[in-house]
């Protein structure tokens, strides 16, 4: 088996986790108490869901995941929620006092009290796997726990499981909507760590997803539940090929191979289509080429960043439902002819496609319509540098006055770590710039070849 362990850190990570496991259970016909009704059990040959669930002797299916927060309230909601019987009680780990939006508290003082318990639990989960493929980590980079403790966790995982892939789903601070004053500090400090210790980071940002909910689902005031269910669909599409069979299945390590041209350039944009409400879906024919086009729409990107301002290096299209390779090839060919979608010229093919025959499942009573086919796109574009430069500007404004820095230093950080992290991000912006430019300089040389064709 190719198991995957999910780690949900901090409030954002746990709430996204709730939405994900709710969806996974629906997709596999697992009840909130972990039982699989007998009619489903007869499909015993279809045990691909064991990548995400482990089965106990009593026929109960337990998610291979850990929920961690430095304060108890959010984890307590899981402990008392609908799915309380699904999770092993030791997988729900909470500390006593929170990180107070402070990276240093999450990373140094409060974090180190909880980290060993977590790693011990992860070790047990890993021992329970026959062929552990890697980790999915869910956290926000703006808070204290997701950023500080999340990075501590990644650093320790790198030591213990060096060769395993780590995919990160990061809730990134939005340009306009802020939940904490010190977000820029936490984000810059944690990105410094994400650069080194994770293989692929998929950027999500609340504001972008709010806009998608408002525009496509006509929800006037989206709640976190609306947002998280949409994020869960993306994560479900990415992992569908691990949990079901399909024509072109994609492994977790394949994301890395196909999307990351250079180790540091591993921050991805994601989009999902079709995001439609039931009233609209009834009147629309959502063909493969239509959903592919809308996955490339800048407005459908789940992070506030416009891919038209950059070039694509690679992208991965994960289709599910009623889709055949012929349609996919046609849709991709159409995308390649569009002038607005530019690829760097050192990566001429640029597309990795996966097809999975399991149609998307929706949460009953949720906002999304039940559709026959859907696509999730993960793309590596130089435009993501916009997200970093926005954050760096905010960081610089505060750091120039050393505002709020004493809270971090008081928790055992050194001021040098701030400037080190900031320099690392400046280097990252430069890297993205060079990856985009490299091609222009090469263009002169290429013209000679083209003439020979």
From Swiss-Prot:
Residue numbers of N6-acetyllysine PTMs: 40
Catalytic residues as annotated in Swiss-Prot or TrEMBL: 254
Site (Involved in polymerization): 453
Matching SMART domains: Tubulin, Tubulin_C
EC number(s) stated in the UniProt entry for this protein: 3.6.5.-
GO BP annotations listed: microtubule-based process
Cofactor names: Mg(2+)
A molecular function GO annotation: metal ion binding
Signal peptide residue numbers: none
Keyword hit for NADP: no
Binding-site list for GTP: 11, 71, 144-145, 179, 206, 228
PTM comment: Undergoes a tyrosination/detyrosination cycle, the cyclic removal and re-addition of a C-terminal tyrosine residue by the enzymes tubulin tyrosine carboxypeptidase (TTCP) and tubulin tyrosine ligase (TTL), respectively. Acetylation of alpha chains at Lys-40 stabilizes microtubules and affects affinity and processivity of microtubule motors. This modification has a role in multiple cellular functions, ranging from cell motility, cell cycle progression or cell differentiation to intracellular trafficking and signaling.
InterPro entries for the chain: Alpha_tubulin (IPR002452), Tub_FtsZ_C (IPR008280), Tubulin (IPR000217), Tubulin/FtsZ-like_C (IPR037103), Tubulin/FtsZ_2-layer-sand-dom (IPR018316), Tubulin/FtsZ_GTPase_sf (IPR036525), Tubulin_C (IPR023123), Tubulin_CS (IPR017975)
Catalytic activity: GTP + H2O = GDP + phosphate + H(+)
Example of a GO cellular component annotation carried by this entry: cytoplasm
Binding site for Mg(2+): 71
UniProt KW keywords: Acetylation, Cytoplasm, Cytoskeleton, GTP-binding, Hydrolase, Magnesium, Metal-binding, Microtubule, Nucleotide-binding
Function: Tubulin is the major constituent of microtubules, a cylinder consisting of laterally associated linear protofilaments composed of alpha- and beta-tubulin heterodimers. Microtubules grow by the addition of GTP-tubulin dimers to the microtubule end, where a stabilizing cap forms. Below the cap, tubulin dimers are in GDP-bound state, owing to GTPase activity of alpha-tubulin.
Quaternary structure note: Dimer of alpha and beta chains. A typical microtubule is a hollow water-filled tube with an outer diameter of 25 nm and an inner diameter of 15 nM. Alpha-beta heterodimers associate head-to-tail to form protofilaments running lengthwise along the microtubule wall with the beta-tubulin subunit facing the microtubule plus end conferring a structural polarity. Microtubules usually have 13 protofilaments but different protofilament numbers can be found in some organisms and specialized cells.
Name the UniProt record assigns to this protein: Tubulin alpha chain
Native source species: Plasmodium falciparum (isolate K1 / Thailand)
